[in-house]
Amino acid sequence: KEGIIDNKNYPFGKDKIQIKFPESIKIGLTQEEVLAIEQLDLTVGSKEWHTRNVWLLSFYLAGIRVADVLETKWEDIQDGRLRYRMNKNQKVVSLKIPDKVLTILSYYEPYRALNGGYVFPELKGVDEKDSKAVLAAIRNANKTLNKYLKRIAKLAKINKNITMHISRHTFGNISGDKISVQMLQKLYRHSSITTTVNYQANFISKDIDDALDAVIDF
């Protein structure tokens, strides 16, 4: 692409040599581990308390991505629903706001003006028309949130690497066989149901476990 080598002589790409990268292992938290996080006695207003709120809100709303969480504004919340446009694919999403999310929102509602209209304060003061500045702020915030999530994991005695993105995997893990793949596709806003099936395959293991037991339990 940079003109360093003629495309005809470039050995990689479509219909040529293709490098296959190993599948990443997706690990989500269990229901018990989420409960442990929920039940932590954290000081109101502390970094850990705030980080837990951001992470749980993401999880409660079907694992919405960190950029979408941090860019959520109060004006996006109307009639008991969150309506926003996904950063990744620009699809419009409308989700009912669960009671647990309403509780989190109540902590931040008094600061809506101070936070520049955002639910969370990470993007206050950032020029939203400057996409590079917004992206940089989100990356920095994500790094900070992940740092405090490590502390939360330690406090909750969870031996897993918890990150903001793990909230999405956690939703997938807990939803398991509880929700149809068609409904999960809508919640995730995947373009193809195949994408949803492949994603959930990382977490749904009951059928495999039952099949294994059926063979060796004699």
Regions found by a protein language model. Name each.
Residues 1-11, 62:
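N-terminal DNA-binding recognition helix of tyrosine site-specific recombinases/integrases
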Residues 14-15, 61, 71-107:
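Conserved tyrosine-mediated DNA breakage-rejoining catalytic core shared by Y-recombinases
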Residues 19-50:
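Long, amphipathic, Lys/Arg-enriched alpha-helical "connector/arm" segment
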Residues 33-34, 98-159:
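Active-site/catalytic core of tyrosine-dependent DNA strand-transfer enzymes
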Residues 39, 43-46, 146-186:
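Short, basic (Lys/Arg/His-rich) helix/loop patches that form interaction surfaces
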Residues 52-65, 174:
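Short pre-functional
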Residues 75-81, 158-160, 179-198:
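Short, polar N-cap/turn motifs at the start of nucleic acid-interacting alpha helices
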Residues 86-90, 125-126, 188-213:
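Catalytic-site neighborhood detector that most strongly recognizes the C-terminal catalytic loop/helix
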